[in-house]
UniProtKB/Swiss-Prot annotation:
InterPro entries: Cupin_2 (IPR013096), PKS_Associated_Protein (IPR052044), RmlC-like_jellyroll (IPR014710), RmlC_Cupin_sf (IPR011051). It comes from the Bacteria. It comes from Streptomyces coelicolor (strain ATCC BAA-471 / A3(2) / M145). Residues 33-100 form the Cupin type-2 domain. This is Uncharacterized protein SCO3923.
């Protein structure tokens, strides 16, 4: 078993000065913590993997392809591989668990 605490993951991510911390990588999936502060820009490009976002905290909008929705704590969003997507109108610091399948390269 592997178990993680969000507060420890956030501290590690912040200490490494990055918006993204991959903390689990297995044969069929990887998981990371993505952080975007209020007012910042999400510069993601489409990925070759399917993704699931689980919003841990914060508020924003996300556009996936041509669809836009508001997200906040507890929101779950699926993004198919190869589809353009980004968070925007980030009104509260956003922390998101990201699951990639297959694992992100």
């Amino acid at each position: 078993m592997k178990a993680f605490r969000l507060d420890e993951l956030e501290a590690e991510r912040a200490a490494n000065d990055g918006a993204y911390l991959q903390f689990l990588r297995e044969r069929n999936m990887s998981v990371g913590l993505y952080a975007l502060d209020a007012g910042t820009t999400d510069s993601q490009k489409p990925h070759a993997q399917d993704e699931v976002y689980f919003v841990v905290s914060g508020r924003a909008a996300i556009t996936v392809g041509m669809e836009t929705t508001q997200v906040a704590r507890g929101s779950v969003v699926y993004v198919p591989a190869g589809v353009a997507h980004k968070f925007h109108h980030i009104s509260e610091d956003l922390r998101v668990l990201v699951v990639f399948s297959p694992p992100e390269s």
